UniProtKB/Swiss-Prot annotation:
<dbReference type="InterPro" id="IPR015422">
    <property type="entry name" value="PyrdxlP-dep_Trfase_small"/>
</dbReference>
<feature type="transit peptide" description="Mitochondrion">
    <location>
        <begin position="1"/>
        <end position="66"/>
    </location>
</feature>
<comment type="subunit">
    <text>Homodimer. The glycine cleavage system is composed of four proteins: P, T, L and H.</text>
</comment>
<dbReference type="GO" id="GO:0005739">
    <property type="term" value="C:mitochondrion"/>
</dbReference>
<dbReference type="InterPro" id="IPR015424">
    <property type="entry name" value="PyrdxlP-dep_Trfase"/>
</dbReference>
<keyword id="KW-0496">Mitochondrion</keyword>
<dbReference type="GO" id="GO:0019464">
    <property type="term" value="P:glycine decarboxylation via glycine cleavage system"/>
</dbReference>
<dbReference type="GO" id="GO:0004375">
    <property type="term" value="F:glycine dehydrogenase (decarboxylating) activity"/>
</dbReference>
<dbReference type="InterPro" id="IPR020581">
    <property type="entry name" value="GDC_P"/>
</dbReference>
<dbReference type="InterPro" id="IPR049315">
    <property type="entry name" value="GDC-P_N"/>
</dbReference>
<protein>
    <recommendedName>
        <fullName>Glycine dehydrogenase (decarboxylating) A, mitochondrial</fullName>
        <ecNumber>1.4.4.2</ecNumber>
    </recommendedName>
</protein>
<dbReference type="GO" id="GO:0009941">
    <property type="term" value="C:chloroplast envelope"/>
</dbReference>
<dbReference type="Pfam" id="PF02347">
    <property type="entry name" value="GDC-P"/>
</dbReference>
<dbReference type="GO" id="GO:0005960">
    <property type="term" value="C:glycine cleavage complex"/>
</dbReference>
<dbReference type="InterPro" id="IPR049316">
    <property type="entry name" value="GDC-P_C"/>
</dbReference>
<keyword id="KW-0663">Pyridoxal phosphate</keyword>
<dbReference type="GO" id="GO:0048046">
    <property type="term" value="C:apoplast"/>
</dbReference>
Amino acid sequence: MERARRLANKAILGRLVSQTKHNPSISSPALCSPSRYVSSLSPYVCSGTNVRSDRNLNGFGSQVRTISVEALKPSDTFPRRHNSATPEEQTKMAEFVGFPNLDSLIDATVPKSIRLDSMKYSKFDEGLTESQMIAHMQDLASKNKIFKSFIGMGYYNTSVPTVILRNIMENPGWYTQYTPYQAEIAQGRLESLLNFQTMVTDLTGLPMSNASLLDEGTAAAEAMAMCNNIQKGKKKTFIIASNCHPQTIDICKTRADGFDLKVVTSDLKDFDYSSGDVCGVLVQYPGTEGELLDYSEFIKNAHANGVKVVMASDLLALTILKPPGELGADIVVGSAQRFGVPMGYGGPHAAFLATSQEYKRMMPGRIIGVSVDSSGKPALRMAMQTREQHIRRDKATSNICTAQALLANMAAMFGVYHGPEGLKTIAKRVHGLAGTFAAGLKKLGTVQVQDLPFFDTVKVTCVDSKAIAEEAYKHKMNLRIVDKNTITVAFDETTTIEDVDTLFKVFALGKPVTFTAASIAPEVQDAIPSGLVRETPYLTHPIFNMYHTEHELLRYISKLQSKDLSLCHSMIPLGSCTMKLNATTEMMPVTWPAFADIHPFAPTEQAQGYQEMFKNLGDLLCTITGFDSFSLQPNAGAAGEYAGLMVIRAYHMARGDHHRNVCIIPVSAHGTNPASAAMCGMKIITVGTDSKGNINIEELRKAAEANKENLSALMVTYPSTHGVYEEGIDEICKIIHDNGGQVYMDGANMNAQVGLTSPGWIGADVCHLNLHKTFCIPHGGGGPGMGPIGVKKHLAPYLPSHPVVATGGIPAPEQSQPLGTIAAAPWGSALILPISYTYIAMMGSQGITNASKIAILNANYMAKRLENHYPILFRGVNGTVAHEFIVDLRPLKTTAGIEPEDVAKRLIDYGFHGPTMSWPVPGTLMIEPTESESKAELDRFCDALISIRQEIAEIEKGNVDLNNNVIKGAPHPPQLLMADKWTKPYSREYAAYPAPWLRAAKFWPTTCRVDNVYGDRNLICTLQPPQEYEEKAEATA
């Protein structure tokens, strides 16, 4: 009906325009007054000229309304929806800062020596409208083919419960949150992540788990690093069983290079510890080809030789298999993907790492712990944060920062929804389907089935595996070809009994099949040996046994969501985090089955839509950055840093410069840089900054020249984390190049570069991009993220590849000499790449350039508004800041006893998430607005900070107590305000409603200030019985 209406209007419009051509009194096409076909809202301009039409369409004379070509263009353009400041507001804000217009401000801020004249896309330059973008993505989706996947290898199709899909994965209340640094406004996702950790510890049989890692392969590499650290680097060999996934083996080999570890791949029977040099071993349980082995004696032997055992496992299998902890494993890693997270052509998925309490401080990634708040009530927080890379720098346990919190929450809710019995039912069904298939093959007699027990994957020996795979292909099924005579078939939650019947026909090789899966199923016996059957209960906490109906889970998800502040509520001005709009149109394709349901190792001809998108995205990113080739494999910013440095390392190695291992890092560089350099085996030299926050060029020159023979790289963030554009950045790059090094640029602050300058133009050789910052992938409460790396032509041959599906640079270099494998999937977290792709395509080159300009404008506007209340620590040569700036609170500690944390907690009462605290400079706040925040929102945040400064002034004047005041008492949750007794020296009303806008809508914290010290001293990282929480709260009170 709607389409017919549009066609009718189009025909009428054409007829009316045609009629005007025959009327000499009309000089341009015109329309009559609004009719029932063309409303008064029609985008045409009245000319004021009266005309007489040959046909009086509506009974009275009308004015001529000339047609504007611009008005005929589609109205659903995207930049005006993303960039919040109107042109009028831009001018007024620039004038407030002290410039006549926005461009004058940008000219004064970005150094002329590195400015681009303009940027032009080779595709989508004018920007697609939102409806055009959806149509384009639908076209790409139609080019993907969804086959039934029986490949396995750590990736399985899964039934994503729609209540979780709609209310978490598609819900901005969950996916626009930041990492839960402000625990008082993050209790919801902290509880969900604690559920995840509890689920992992229960199933693995080990007491400690983190809140997610990037993927199973990198989790195994982290475990290998742990083994090296446990042995204090004294044992330099790590053995990997050949029954591990090939991508895991390659990732570990790549990572081992940086630690100078020797990786040996061997059959289990050939493991040799006689050298005394083995720090750890890695085994798979179940194996990559499906076999189930009892590792009890193997682990005892390893321990007897002082060797740590890492076990890669499968959470669904562990619902019915003896847990690795009971077998004696020291560390367990794996992926939670098959717990309700789509395959997504490789990710994102939540990996995990579990271990014993003994190694808790060596664990990578975020860990959620139980603590208490200032009232003594239980509260959750991120535990042991002093392990993290921005604090310990090159001494950190890992460079991991953004992980996979959103996907961990989905997996946790999958466990909550199904509960222990539901999960066991799924596992037994999958195992039953595999067993039925194996029994049927034995009955057919055309192939040979492995004798070893299995869980979900059946190994088959045949005459011609390729012929069988091709037959399966005809039925839209993908099998794994191991070698010319071996094939494996992996079953999952979505497999049906009819699929098994189809597989019988495939493997019958033309022979009649005289039975069905249903007919032989009653004869099939459990294939799991009695010694490996799980007996230990799991998921016994009430949370996993209460929410098994959709209504109950919906309410539980909503209850947790209500505790968390997200971009749905207010701006999140965290410096170097770029919390910008995650537009609905950008997010929509992520959950389309045509993108979500493809196995990462499916033949590429089944993913032509993805491949076309990869090519387009690679070309667009090259245009934006000035680079020649991109790798999309790194699935986090920290992974991108590591990958970029490893590319530089491979380049030096290929030239015979094995000795080049010195990395210079300014103190103004991004916090993960030193940890990433350490992972690559580099020797780190730190250089300082001057009083204006710029890199001390003379100090850098001396460092480069003193290490000329061994210089590998410089890691630099641009603009710097001090919030300034280095005027001498081109000179800095030249110094490094003149001394034989390469320039690695951290892309954390790319939001201040796009369209104005570029890493390649400035002189960088390699740069990673945080797609979850500049390019709109949401932060998800702590992940997912993406960190693709762009390189100049001379580095392109060394971009990472993959052992299962060959990959490399986009566009591909003339020659390839890949450094190894960085992530478990060939193209990283491919499922979220459509988000960045649609953002770039819809913005067009002008819109995305304006985004950078407005981000800079917003930061300068806020800095100007705040400068009379707080010192702005660093500014550029013309007195401006970049897209972020640092507010100096250090004097307030002396005058009022106020720390950055106090200001951040009071901001919660005003409805805001605090800025980045005490980094990169201790005692400061780093503020980054983005282009998608309105002037009204910026003003509210500034008003809040100014109001807090006035509250601090009352302390300075001695009008209120130094320790008992509204700032030290913040935040103020409802339960505190509603208590029978109120002993504070300020009113409840002032505590709760310090600003007038809060009367209309207020976000409430759900806990008082959380005690960080108590949580680390009394470390609890799993759900405890409810009565224990109550007893602990009473004891604390």
